[in-house]
From Swiss-Prot:
NCBIfam families, per database record: PRK14139.1, PRK14140.1, PRK14141.1, PRK14150.1
Annotated GO biological process: protein folding
Record's subunit section: Homodimer.
Lineage, broadest ranks: Bacteria, Pseudomonadati, Pseudomonadota, Alphaproteobacteria, Hyphomicrobiales
Organism field: Brucella canis (strain ATCC 23365 / NCTC 10854 / RM-666)
Name assigned to this protein: Protein GrpE
Record-linked PANTHER family: GRPE PROTEIN (PTHR21237), GRPE PROTEIN HOMOLOG, MITOCHONDRIAL (PTHR21237:SF23)
Length: 230
């Protein structure tokens, strides 16, 4: 295309006489035009190469930026996940602190309640009937015990009442066995000392007696199976 534009107006330059001034001028003009065309082509090729190099450099920069963006996004997601886990752990710790803050205090108060109950149980029934003052004192101590247990209950402490339930080592402590073929094996038949729990944690296991020699309860479906007496 550039060659066609730079062709001399007279196509038969090879037939011109170099000794003729006019022909010599025409040949010179044709040579100048040819050189200009070649220089223009060279500049165009150089510009194209430079543009291609700039495109490649831009593409490389874009690739680097995209990689950096992906890495930063991954870091941000990891930080967000860690912050969410930290928030959940903190919330759980706060809830546990609220629920179990009085654990040691409640355990000490249960010991006091046990002592009050032992004192009440140690008073003979005939002595209560014979002495009105002793009876009034006993009633006052019993009211104090009930008020103490109610106060603990308001703060999340609940009494375990396992009599008639299947023995659970997580909540009960077996003190003795009672032969009884009429009850499923390992049924709680007597509570020696009440147990207590706070939230989902055992504050004190219930001390119990369990049955022995009755039908065994299946762990899967609760069906009873016969079991020989030991």
């Amino acid at each position: 295309m550039a060659d066609e534009k730079n062709k001399p107006e007279n196509p038969d330059l090879d037939q011109r006489d170099i000794n003729n001034p006019r022909d010599r001028e025409a040949l010179k003009q044709a040579a100048d035009d040819f050189l200009k065309a070649r220089r223009a082509e060279a500049r165009a090729e150089a510009a194209a190469d430079e543009a291609e190099g700039e495109v490649d450099e831009t593409a490389n920069r874009i690739a680097v930026l995209e990689a950096d963006n992906t890495e930063l996004k991954d870091q941000m997601l990891r930080v967000a996940a860690e912050m969410e886990n930290l928030r959940k752990r903190t919330q759980r710790d706060v809830q546990d602190a609220r629920a179990y803050a009085i654990t040691n205090f409640a355990r000490d108060m249960l010991s006091v309640s046990d002592n009050l109950r032992r004192a009440l149980d140690a008073i003979p029934a005939d002595a209560l009937e014979a002495d009105s003052n002793l009876k009034s004192l006993s009633e006052g101590v019993e009211m104090t015990e009930r008020a103490m247990l109610l106060a603990l209950e308001r703060h999340g402490v609940k009494k375990l009442e396992p009599e008639g339930q299947k023995f659970d080592p997580n909540f009960h402590q077996a003190m003795f066995e009672v032969p009884n073929p009429d009850l499923p094996n390992n049924t709680v038949v007597q509570v020696v000392q009440a147990g207590y729990a706070i939230g989902d944690r055992v504050l004190r296991p219930a001390m119990v007696g369990v049955s022995k020699g009755g039908p065994k309860v299946s762990a899967e479906n609760g069906a009873s199976t016969s079991e020989d007496n030991a």
